[in-house]
Amino acid sequence: MKANELREKSAEELNTELLNLLREQFNLRMQASSGQLQQTHLLKQVRRNVARVKTLLTEKAGA
């Protein structure tokens, strides 16, 4: 997910996206802890996407 794509979304859409990412992160962490996760790079990608969305929400709140 690109930051430019996220910048076009409204704050409500970003909150929805954040909720989806946090759910996905939880599921990936559960899979990793049980040894079922084959693609461990997804944890890093989702964590960074969460950070991107939170950053944009903070920017929009300040603007």
Curated annotation (Swiss-Prot):
Superkingdom: Bacteria
GO molecular function: structural constituent of ribosome
Ribosomal protein listed as a keyword: yes
Entry GO CC: cytosolic large ribosomal subunit
Gene3D superfamilies: 6.10.140.1970
One GO process term, biological-process aspect: translation
Alphabetical list of InterPro entries matching this protein: Ribosomal_protein_uL29 (IPR050063), Ribosomal_uL29 (IPR001854), Ribosomal_uL29_CS (IPR018254), Ribosomal_uL29_sf (IPR036049)
Keywords for the protein's UniProt record, in alphabetical order: Ribonucleoprotein, Ribosomal protein
One Pfam family cited in the UniProt record for this chain: Ribosomal_L29
Similarity comment: Belongs to the universal ribosomal protein uL29 family.
Name of the featured protein: Large ribosomal subunit protein uL29
Gene: rpmC
